[in-house]
């Protein structure tokens, strides 16, 4: 699939001449060629432009991980959330403590929007960094809500003891519904998970999926 991206004030083009429809996030063959001032950009910059200036749909990405994370998982949660928020993605998490709080902290530190999908019926259970707490009252079934509401999920941990079966369920739901599921260093091993070594790599993968590039 062509992945050369050309950006101008008028829109975003792919190397094969297709232009992105920001509302449907689908590529359509353009009537006109990219203007002379169009410049080549990476997926992260292109996604940021679509989200901020191109009137694109603000699809949320999810950060998932355990309530009792290791220091590495905490660091990855904060770094990935920060990288995604800097592009302009609204984020979803479970809304409470552990990796969820670290992700919320990283997101809000750079002015991002964090949505917390809470299992209880009390929005006050959300950590202090959640901007929009959604009290579902559906218990662990909220894991399915997180996995299907996000177009991409990044798992930052859950493989180390104690194993996070909640995180595994979110990853499995995401894979079942065709979402991009990224695994950082300590994420559980599941078939279909895309492994990333850094927050920047994860953010680039999420941006490419948002732009329907892979």
Task: Cite the ranges covered by each PLM segment.
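Generic structural signal for short, solvent-exposed loop/turn connectors between secondary structure elements
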Residues: 32-38, 69-72, 121-128, 183-198
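Acidic/glycine-enriched connector segments
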Residues: 78-79, 94, 98-177, 183-191
């Amino acid at each position: 699939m062509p992945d050369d991206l050309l950006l101008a004030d008028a829109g975003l083009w792919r190397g094969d001449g297709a232009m992105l429809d920001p509302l449907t996030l689908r590529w359509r063959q353009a009537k006109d060629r990219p203007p002379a001032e169009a410049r080549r950009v990476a997926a992260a910059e292109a996604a940021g432009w679509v989200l901020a200036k191109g009137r694109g749909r603000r699809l949320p990405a999810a950060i998932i991980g355990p309530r009792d994370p290791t220091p590495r998982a905490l660091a990855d949660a904060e770094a990935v959330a920060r990288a995604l928020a800097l592009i302009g993605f609204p984020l979803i998490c479970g809304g409470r403590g552990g990796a969820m709080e670290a992700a919320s902290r990283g997101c809000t530190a750079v002015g991002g929007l964090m949505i917390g999908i809470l299992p209880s019926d009390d929005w006050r259970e959300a950590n202090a960094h959640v901007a929009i707490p959604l009290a579902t009252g559906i218990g662990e079934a909220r894991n399915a809500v997180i996995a299907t509401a996000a177009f991409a999920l990044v798992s930052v941990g859950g493989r180390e003891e104690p194993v996070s079966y909640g995180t595994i369920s979110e990853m499995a739901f995401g894979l079942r519904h065709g979402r991009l599921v990224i695994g950082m260093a300590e994420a559980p091993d599941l078939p279909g998970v895309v492994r990333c070594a850094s927050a920047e790599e994860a953010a680039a993968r999420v941006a490419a999926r948002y732009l329907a590039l892979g």
